[in-house]
Amino acid sequence: MVLISVLANLLILQLSYAQKSSELVIGGDECNINEHRFLVALYNSRSRTLFCGGTLINQEWVLTAAHCERKNFRIKLGIHSKKVPNEDEQTRVPKEKFFCLSSKNYTLWDKDIMLIRLDSPVSNSEHIAPLSLPSSPPSVGSVCRIMGWGRISPTKETYPDVPHCANINLLEYEMCRAPYPEFGLPATSRTLCAGILEGGKDTCRGDSGGPLICNGQFQGIASWGDDPCAQPHKPAAYTKVFDHLDWIQSIIAGNTDASCPP
């Protein structure tokens, strides 16, 4: 019964962030149009609603969160304003999707990562360019950049037309573990913890899958957090990109049987 209760609580917290998949960065400002050439938007093919973000890591591959998986979606690149398109915007659909286990087996602290191969390569342009994978792991205390088209109010369904950006801090993992004792999060994890302890700045619904950029390097993928967002002493968790480098690079090289770190 205890296990069932824990699993139920984990599902609730997973859903709370997945449901935030249409929210924007809270406490931020409009991103400079030239600072997010790698940022992609995942759209529902039927409703045309933006539900997640992602990061272009080369001309043919996008990295996002596993919980952003949907049956039918499109990937828009080179987008800034949802209402006023850039001339160099491009749209792709997934050709292949790769998960550490499967889209249904990720956990709050592990394997919330999805690697997408596009149906055709994109070309670099004024508003499109990939972001390199990290060369070293991040350090606690680093200043990190978050961005996305997610909700800009922690409690209201307020969505921006353009992506918002904010700076937050990389924190000790325990700062994400301590606020949620009921979830039994492990003592160590392949996730990063980032936020502002006094609250006010955070990723939120719709920012899932987007990048966490620390000291200029792509270090994390927005995974989960509290709802309402941006609450004091409740930072958010990000899948640690550096720990998955071997898996990512193996898949891109053609070794589709590669396994994620244990």
From Swiss-Prot:
Negative results: does not show lysine esterase and caseinolytic activity. Residues 19-24 form a propeptide. This is Thrombin-like enzyme calobin-1. N-glycosylated. Expressed by the venom gland. Residues 25-253 form the Peptidase S1 domain. GO terms for cellular component: extracellular region; secretory granule.
